[in-house]
C-alpha cells in the first residue's frame, strides 16, 4: 500500500526522508501563511556548501538584506529582530535551495556530513505531553491506518523529534509488548558523555527507555514530535493536531520536559 500523503510524496521526490522544526509546522516544500518570527529570534544556517553574496541576493529582497550576514563564509546569519519580512515561504526557500546540492538526503542528519544549525534565543517553556497511541488506528476514515499497523507489526515504528540544547530534560518511552515501540537512538548525534540512555524492564510487561541529560546537553526537542517510518513515509504530529487521536493499542509516549533559558536546535 503506497503512502499518498502530499508531504511525503513531495519529500520523496526531493530525496528527503525527514524534516524537523521547533515549535512550528513549517515544511520546506510548502508555503504557509504564518511567519516564523514567533518561533525564532535569530537563525544561523550552516553548511559545508560555501554561500556567496549572489546566493544571498537570489533568496532575499533588498529590503530585508540588512538582516542577513555571512559567518566566516560558512553559513548564513539571519537576525529576525531586524526585519518583519521573513516569512515561512522565505524559510522554505532557504532550506530547499541552500541544501539541494549539498544534501540529497535528510534524515535527522545530512548524509554528506553537512549540518544545519538553527540558533534559537529566549526559549522558556515547561511541558509535559502524553501521546497515547490507540484511537487513531481505530479510525476507519483514515486511509493510512493499515500502513501504520503493518509498520508497527514489522517493528519499523519510530519516534523522533528535533534536537534541542537545554538545561535539563528527561524523556521516557514505555511499551507493553516488547518490540512494538522503537526509538531510533542511532540517529541521535553528539550526546553528552554523561547523558543517561538506558533500557529498563519494569516487571514482566513493560519495557522502558529513559533518556536524561545532565545539566546541559543536546537532547530531544519538545514542541514538535514526528512519527516516521523507514519505508512508507512520514506522519507528522504537532501542537495544531489533535493529540487525543492516536496510534496503536497499549502504546504510550510520555515526554517529561523542563526547558529553560536560550538554546539551539541542531541537526548534524
Swiss-Prot record:
Outcome after substituting residue 246 to A: Reduced cleavage, still toxic
Keyword Secreted listed: no
Region (C-terminal region): 248-268
The UniProt record lists the keyword Cell membrane: yes
PTM statement from Swiss-Prot or TrEMBL: Palmitoylation helps stabilize the inactive state; may self-palmitoylate. Palmitoylation is not required for permeabilization of liposomes by the ring-like pores in vitro. Palmitoylation plays a significant role in pore formation.
Effect annotated for changing residue 250 to A: Partially cleaved by protease, non-toxic
Lipidation sites (S-palmitoyl cysteine): 3
Record key words, sorted: Antiviral defense, Cell inner membrane, Cell membrane, Cytoplasm, Lipoprotein, Membrane, Palmitate, Transmembrane, Transmembrane beta strand
Ranges annotated as spanning the membrane: 78-94, 103-121, 168-185, 195-211
Swiss-Prot/TrEMBL GO biological process terms: defense response to virus
Leader peptide range in chain numbering: none
Domain of life the protein comes from: Bacteria
GO cellular component, one term: plasma membrane
Cleavage (site feature) positions: 247-248
Entry text on domains: The N-terminus has marked structural similarity to the mammalian gasdermin N-terminal domain. The C-terminal region wraps around the twisted beta sheet core, probably stabilizing the inactive state. The C-terminal region can assume multiple conformations.
Family listed: Belongs to the bacterial gasdermin family.
Full protein name: Gasdermin bGSDM
Organism: Runella zeae (strain ATCC BAA-293 / DSM 19591 / LMG 21438 / NS12)
